């Protein structure tokens, strides 16, 4: 078509590779990668990472989200797929629907070496004298190339721990607790030409229900990931300013607590074993975008 796709940053980011594209959240980089990759390969990889299907959480009402394809659009909407829709899907916009749980699972699979994880609220249900139910822990390899995963993990580290990264102001300063992650902003709607003429120039000048959603996914510690987290703040604005600080506070608190807990257990002579599960049960599907910079 005749549409022009712009980056969130006026003037763009210049020459960009994977690390810079992720670290500085360059829309145009991901538009180009999506164009070269195509919607079918994007959809196939998204499903491997946990999108587009229920994950099996131990609660009713889990939503599957949606990963679109040419076949889906022809069946549901009755028209063929367009290249511009591939570009939008490449940054999680358009028809894409995700849940906070899926975002956290995606992050876990990216940083744990490409192993499928099955999210559970509990590991075991135990009566007074026996285990009543034990949740199955899946350890299926989803077939990702280790060197590719290492590149993504390094880029997510730079998002938070390199000064040019979009979440640098939300970094955890204690070296052993450092987190990596990715900021995102899910656009609710564009500012119209008429609104711009009336001096409505910024997203936070729109009515609250029409403002962008703030997103961040993260993991910690960077060197040996143990925790994955997703934060979605509806109508919160930019992910770097709103969602990333929440993830930082949670991940730092959990790690500090576990260090103190293990120290207390060791001093009492008990084995220092900890099982921590953090879950966001707000699994409403929403339109999401994970390349839009902020």
Which stretches of residues belong to each language-model region?
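Short, gly/Ser/Thr-rich active-site loops of penicillin-recognizing serine hydrolases
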Residues: 131-140, 246-294
């Amino acid at each position: 078509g005749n549409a022009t796709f712009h980056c969130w940053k006026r003037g763009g980011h210049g020459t960009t590779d994977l690390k810079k594209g992720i670290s500085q959240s360059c829309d145009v980089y991901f538009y180009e990668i999506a164009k070269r990759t195509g919607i079918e390969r994007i959809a196939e990889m998204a499903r491997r990472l946990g999108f587009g299907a229920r994950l099996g959480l131990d609660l009713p009402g889990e939503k599957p989200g949606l990963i679109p394809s040419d076949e889906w659009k022809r069946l549901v909407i009755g028209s063929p797929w367009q290249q511009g829709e591939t570009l939008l899907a490449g940054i999680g916009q358009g028809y894409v629907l995700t849940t906070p749980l899926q975002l956290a699972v995606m992050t876990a699979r990216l940083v744990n070496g490409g192993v499928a994880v099955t999210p559970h609220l509990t590991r075991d249900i135990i009566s007074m004298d026996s285990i009543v139910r034990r949740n199955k822990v899946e350890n299926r390899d989803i077939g990702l190339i280790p060197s590719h995963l290492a590149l993504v993990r390094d880029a997510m580290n730079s998002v938070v721990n390199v000064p040019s990264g979009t979440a640098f102001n939300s970094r955890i300063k204690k070296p052993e607790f450092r987190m990596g992650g990715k900021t995102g902003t899910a656009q609710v709607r564009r500012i119209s030409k008429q609104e711009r003429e009336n001096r409505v120039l910024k997203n936070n000048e729109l009515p609250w229900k029409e403002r962008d959603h703030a997103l961040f996914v993260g993991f910690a510690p960077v060197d040996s990931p143990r925790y994955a987290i997703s934060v979605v703040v509806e109508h919160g604005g930019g992910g770097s300013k709103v969602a990333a600080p929440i993830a930082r506070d949670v991940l730092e608190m959990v790690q500090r607590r576990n260090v103190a807990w293990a120290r207390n257990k060791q001093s009492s002579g008990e084995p220092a074993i900890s099982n921590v599960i953090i879950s966001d049960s707000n699994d409403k599907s929403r339109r999401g975008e994970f390349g839009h910079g902020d």
